[in-house]
């Protein structure tokens, strides 16, 4: 195990899949295999050709492997803890697989359950169909068997009858042959005796032949007559069926024609209503347009007159003012007294007029009501005449009332018209201007509010409305699906009910058809039996008369009977085949006839209600004609009323215009006549007249507005009264028409039902009587002649009735089972639906719980990762300081000469070429060491590492820590280890720490990271390295206990050299460590910690030495302090640049993660994540602003950092 682990080394410092120490021997990844192959190549260069050094090299290699293995285990444990990423990944994959498998198992169980239910329903339906088919096939087989048995019995009986007939005919033939032989012998003997007897016998034989032919001809004529009668009966039956078919067709045609007439009349009525509406709308639009045009014309005339008057008033302003003031003063005094009197008279007149108008309207309404009640019993013409009389009276009253109002207004307004017109024009103009300004301001404000509302709607209300619309659309879709399902179920139930009714009616119709056919067949059999009885009597009479003719007649009769039986058999077989074919056609074409069942049922109802519809159509036609005439007359009346109103309005306008022009003319003449007298008196009373004029105008405006309001109110009341009157009249007409139509339809329907019931009762009574008579006749004849056949028929009928009852019971049972199965299927479907709904709800709850658990788990992981990362950074810092101290102690002896040489060169350059320093005393090596490490090489290496990490510059591998160790030991294998170590990368942060890292930043983390970094590494290194204190300050007599060869102590009896650490940067190692660390996204204080600026001086070994060594010369001390201050400033600048750069990287990664999260959330939008998305957007904006600021700072710091790096390089070159 040790060999396998020891053979592995670091390649690039990255372990992609780190494992615990227990699982390392079992898992060999490609990375470790590649790492394992590298030391083999490097070890080939390690070995020397000398054989005496092989053992030492081998021991050193094993030691290095043990140290590397130990550091690897420590790094894995510190980085990942007790649980490695591979095991965590495996556990996470197992959990995901278990979750996916659980969901899949639930979905599989639901799908299996649904599949089983579907298969069970299909199997049940197939079993039901198979059972139904099997039952039908069984009944069909039973019917076929019974038919075969009947055919066999009939054939057996036929063969027996044929055999009997053949035997009888053979016996008759034998008897006839014997008689013929006997007659031949006798005839021959007689011929021998006498020729006369021969001729006599021949004559007699011919006479018998003639009689036989005559009898046969008579029988043939009778048979011909019977056949013709039968053919006539069949033709009559066909004609009867054809006539019934024609009647049905005529009934359907009449029904269709009535329906078409109805539809046509309804369309005409609707068209007429539409035309009336259009005409009414056109009339209203015409009235409005006429009003608008008239108003515009009057306004234009008034505007023109006002402009003309204004032009005149511009020339005669003073004259008009003085005359107007005097006239207004006088007019106001007279008008005030006159208005007081007129107000009382107007109030009395208005009260009287209102009382009279109310009385007239009340009397008109009462008379109209009485006339309407009386007109219901009279004809329509009298109603129209009464209506015209009422309207003429109303027009007369209206004209009288209007003429009186006009006369009263003329009397009131004549004295004050000339003063009101000018003021009215001015006030109207001011009012128009104010209204227009208000309208403009209101419109501007509305536009501003509308713009704000549109912006608010687009920003806030539009997404909410879209979301509500989307939810409403989903709810509407679900409701539509449920509605379609309900409609389908209702349609299926209706189809089943209609099919059941149709099937019952078809069965009844089939039974009726079968009864009619059986009656026809029985009538035919009765006729055949009658003819047979008559013929049998005649044949018996002939047999009594002549036996020879009886034999021929019996033979012919038997032939006729055989033919009749064959015909009857063929007819019965044809009927049976036709019946079976119809049954099969009805059975196989039931699916096609199902869609036509409803139409057939409607046709049957239409045939029954044919007479009622005819009467209804006639009544409706007459009522439509009456309504049309009434509406035409009412429209003519309305047109006349409108024309009268238009004429009245035109006359009113013309009269007002004439009055206005007359008043203006009179006012002009009066003003021109009184100009001279008004000039003197108007100047003293200007102020008084103005005040009085304003008050008078205010009161006049109020009075005129009240009068206009009363006029408008009266006109509106009159219009409403007219509308109410017309509406009540139409409502009464419509109610009376509807009541009459309903009563007539109810009477017709009752009469039709009564007639149909009476016909049905008569038909049933006649059918019952015919059945009783027919059964009596059948009983009598069957009891007399065919008792055996009657018994067989009774038995067969009883069996058939029982079979039919059993078949009906079976059908009912099958229908009941089918109905129960359908109900069970629907209940099962409802249960499955509820179970599926519960499953979906439980699944959503489970998903929500899992999401909450995942969020809590992610937060917990983030906290744990942050704490572990802080601990790791503190441990790595302590470990690196310890390792640096150990390597410096081990390399002190090997690099002591180089340090001395560098110090002497530095002294020469600092003191100048003229100054000479004292030669150093010879150093003797002893157990005591003055300073323990070559700080020049260590700090130079660290500075080189820092510059290498900041500017990606290549440095020789001997400047690293392991390189100095290898140089001290004299082993070249350490060079490769140092190169691998220097090129190693730090461990990556897990992926779960990258999510939403910027949202959890707080100042507490910064303080926590600084506190953990500022802790002494002694407390954390005791657990890692077994309590060995590696971070103690380097005192002169104390050395840390580290593995490795001990160096011999050196004594310095003379002047001690100044340490190189005094001129090197104190925190170069820290800078190198910071630069060597990878940039991890997240906040800088705990994601990527940096060394604090105020470090403890005991932590740096160089500072501890420099504090002990005091400078000899003052110039050297001043030079050292200036150089140290410069290097500290360079260090601070580089450190600040590095921190800003790492902060920029972390902010950029945080912004990228936030953008990715936003893209993912926008791909699957949810209503709960809207607030969270807004927070993330604001956070993203803050991070982007921070990125921009950091980028600007980096741009500003690039030039000073470049100068600092150039300065450090120059110092290194100078020291080397």
Swiss-Prot record:
Protein origin, superkingdom: Eukaryota
Positions of region (Disordered): 940-967, 1003-1029, 1066-1085
InterPro entries: CACF_protein
Gene Ontology MF term list: phosphatase binding
Main location: cytoplasm
Ranges for the HAT repeats: 114-146, 148-177, 246-278, 375-407, 1122-1154
UniProt key word Transmembrane: no
Compartments (UniProt record): Cytoplasm, Cytoskeleton, Microtubule organizing center, Centrosome, Centriole
GO cellular component term of the entry, any: centriole
Region described as Interaction with CETN2: spans on this chain: 87-106, 451-470, 617-636
Keywords per UniProt: Cytoplasm, Cytoskeleton, Repeat
Family from the record: Belongs to the SFI1 family.
Chain's role: Plays a role in the dynamic structure of centrosome-associated contractile fibers via its interaction with CETN2.
PANTHER family per record: PROTEIN SFI1 HOMOLOG, SFI1 SPINDLE BODY DOMAIN-CONTAINING PROTEIN-RELATED
Subunit structure: Interacts with CETN2 (via C-terminus).
Description of its domains: CETN2-binding regions contains a conserved Trp residue in their C-terminal ends, which seems critical for interaction with CETN2.
Official protein name in the record: Protein SFI1 homolog
Gene assigned in the entry: Sfi1
């Amino acid at each position: 195990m040790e060999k396998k682990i020891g053979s592995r080394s670091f390649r690039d410092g990255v372990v992609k899949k780190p494992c615990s120490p227990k699982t390392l021997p079992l898992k060999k990844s490609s990375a470790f295999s590649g790492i394992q192959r590298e030391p083999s190549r490097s070890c080939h260069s390690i070995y020397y050709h000398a054989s005496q050094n092989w053992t030492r090299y081998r021991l050193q290699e094993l030691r290095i492997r043990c140290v590397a293995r130990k550091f690897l285990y420590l790094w894995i444990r510190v980085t990942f803890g007790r649980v490695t990423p591979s095991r965590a990944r495996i556990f996470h994959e197992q959990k995901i697989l278990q979750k996916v498998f659980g969901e899949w198992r639930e979905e599989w169980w639901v799908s299996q359950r649904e599949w089983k239910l579907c298969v069970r329903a299909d199997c049940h339906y197939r079993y039901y169909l198979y059972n139904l088919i099997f039952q039908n096939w069984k009944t069909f087989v039973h019917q076929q068997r019974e038919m075969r048995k009947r055919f066999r019995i009939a054939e057996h009986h036929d063969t027996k009858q044929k055999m009997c007939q053949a035997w009888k005919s053979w016996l008759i033939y034998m008897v006839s042959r014997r008689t013929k032989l006997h007659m031949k012998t006798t005839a021959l003997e007689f011929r021998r005796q006498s020729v006369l007897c021969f001729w006599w016998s021949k004559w007699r034989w011919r006479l018998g032949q003639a009689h036989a032919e005559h009898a046969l001809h008579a029988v043939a004529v009778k048979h011909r007559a019977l056949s013709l009668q039968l053919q006539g009966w069949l033709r009559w039956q066909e004609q009867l069926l054809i006539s019934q078919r024609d009647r049905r067709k005529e009934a359907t045609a009449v029904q269709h024609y009535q329906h078409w007439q109805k539809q046509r009349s309804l369309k005409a009525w609707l068209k007429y209503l539409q035309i009336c509406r259009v005409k009414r709308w056109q009339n209203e639009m015409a009235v409005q347009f006429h009003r608008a045009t008239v108003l515009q014309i009057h306004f234009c005339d008034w505007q023109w007159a006002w402009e003309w008057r204004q032009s005149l008033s511009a020339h005669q302003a003073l004259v008009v003012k003085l005359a107007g003031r005097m006239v207004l003063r006088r007019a106001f005094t007279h008008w005030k007294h006159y208005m007081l009197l007129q107000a009382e008279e107007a109030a009395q007149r208005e009260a009287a007029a209102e009382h009279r108008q109310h009385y007239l309207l009340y009397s008109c309404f009462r008379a109209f009501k009485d006339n309407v009640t009386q007109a219901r019993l009279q004809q329509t013409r009298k109603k129209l005449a009464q209506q015209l009389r009422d309207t003429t009276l109303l027009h007369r009253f209206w004209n009288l009332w209007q003429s009186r109002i006009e006369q009263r207004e003329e009397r009131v307004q004549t004295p004050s018209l000339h003063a009101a017109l000018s003021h009215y024009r001015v006030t109207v103009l001011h009012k128009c201007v104010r209204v227009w300004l208000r309208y403009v301001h209101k419109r501007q404000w509305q536009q501003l509010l509308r713009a704000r509302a549109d912006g608010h709607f687009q920003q806030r209300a539009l997404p909410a409305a879209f979301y509500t619309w989307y939810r409403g659309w989903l709810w509407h879709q679900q409701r539509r699906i449920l509605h379609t399902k309900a409609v389908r179920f209702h349609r299926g139930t209706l189809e089943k009910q209609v099919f059941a009714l149709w099937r019952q009616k078809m069965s009844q119709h089939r039974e009726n058809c079968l009864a009619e056919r059986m009656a026809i067949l029985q009538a035919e059999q009765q006729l055949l039996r009658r003819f047979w009885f008559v013929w049998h009597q005649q044949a018996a009479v002939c047999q009594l008369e002549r036996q020879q003719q009886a034999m021929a007649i019996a033979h012919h009769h038997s032939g006729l009977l055989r033919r009749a039986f064959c015909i009857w058999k063929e007819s019965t077989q044809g009927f049976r085949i036709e019946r079976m074919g119809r049954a099969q056609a009805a059975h196989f074409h039931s699916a096609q006839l199902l869609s036509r069942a409803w139409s057939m049922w409607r046709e049957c109802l239409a045939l029954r209600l044919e007479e009622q519809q005819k009467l209804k159509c006639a009544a409706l036609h007459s009522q439509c004609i009456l309504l049309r005439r009434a509406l035409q007359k009412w429209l003519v009346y309305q047109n006349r009323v409108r024309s009268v109103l238009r004429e009245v309005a035109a006359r009113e306008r013309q009269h007002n215009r004439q009055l206005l022009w007359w008043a203006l003319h009179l006012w002009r003449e009066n003003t021109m006549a009184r100009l001279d007298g008004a000039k003197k008196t108007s100047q003293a009373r200007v102020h008084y007249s103005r005040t009085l004029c304003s008050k008078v105008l205010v009161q006049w405006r109020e009075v005129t507005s009240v009068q206009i309001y009363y006029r408008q109110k009266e006109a509106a009341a009159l219009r409403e009264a007219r509308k109410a009157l017309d509406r009540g009249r139409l409502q009464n007409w419509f109610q009376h028409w509807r009541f009459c139509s309903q009563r007539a339809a109810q009477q017709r329907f009752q009469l039709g039902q009564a007639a149909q019931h009476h016909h049905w009762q008569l038909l049933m009574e006649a059918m019952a009587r015919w059945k009783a008579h027919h059964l009596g006749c059948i009983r009598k004849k069957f009891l007399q002649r065919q008792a055996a056949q009657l018994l067989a028929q009774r038995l067969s009928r009883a069996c058939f009735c029982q079979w039919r009852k059993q078949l009906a019971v079976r059908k009912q049972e099958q229908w009941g089972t089918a109905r129960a199965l359908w109900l069970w299927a629907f209940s099962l479907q409802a249960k499955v639906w509820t179970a599926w709904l519960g499953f979906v709800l439980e699944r959503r709850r489970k998903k929500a719980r899992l999401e909450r658990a995942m969020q809590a788990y992610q937060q917990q992981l983030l906290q744990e990762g942050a704490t572990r990362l802080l601990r790791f950074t503190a441990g790595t810092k302590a470990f690196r300081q310890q390792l640096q101290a150990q390597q410096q102690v081990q390399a002190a002896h090997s690099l002591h000469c180089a340090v001395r040489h560098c110090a002497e060169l530095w002294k020469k350059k600092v003191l100048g070429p003229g100054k000479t320093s004292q030669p150093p005393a010879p150093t003797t090596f002893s157990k005591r060491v003055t300073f323990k490490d070559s700080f020049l090489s260590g700090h130079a290496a660290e500075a080189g590492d820092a510059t290498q990490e900041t500017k990606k510059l290549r440095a020789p591998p001997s400047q690293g820590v392991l390189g100095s160790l290898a140089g001290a030991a004299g082993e070249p294998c350490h060079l490769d280890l140092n190169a691998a170590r220097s090129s190693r990368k730090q461990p990556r942060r897990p992926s779960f720490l990258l999510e939403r890292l910027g949202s959890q930043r707080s100042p507490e983390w910064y303080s926590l990271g600084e506190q953990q970094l500022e802790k002494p590494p002694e407390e954390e290194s005791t657990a890692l390295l077994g309590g060995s204190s590696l971070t103690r300050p380097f005192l002169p007599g104390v050395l840390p206990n580290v593995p490795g060869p001990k160096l011999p102590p050196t004594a310095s009896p003379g002047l001690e050299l100044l340490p190189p650490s005094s001129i090197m940067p104190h925190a170069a190692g820290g800078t190198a460590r910071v630069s060597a660390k990878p940039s991890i996204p997240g906040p800088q204080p705990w994601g990527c910690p940096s060394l604090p600026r105020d470090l403890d001086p005991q932590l740096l070994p160089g500072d501890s030495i420099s504090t002990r060594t005091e400078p000899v010369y003052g110039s050297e001390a001043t030079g050292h302090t200036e150089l140290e201050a410069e290097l500290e400033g360079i260090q601070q600048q580089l450190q600040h640049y590095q921190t800003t750069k790492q902060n920029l990287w972390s902010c950029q990664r945080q912004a990228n993660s936030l953008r990715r999260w936003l893209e993912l959330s926008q791909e699957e939008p949810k209503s709960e994540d809207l607030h969270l998305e807004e927070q993330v957007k604001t956070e993203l904006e803050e991070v982007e602003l921070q990125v921009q600021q950091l980028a600007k700072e980096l741009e500003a710091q690039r030039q000073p950092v470049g100068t600092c790096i150039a300065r450090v390089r120059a110092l290194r070159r100078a020291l080397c």
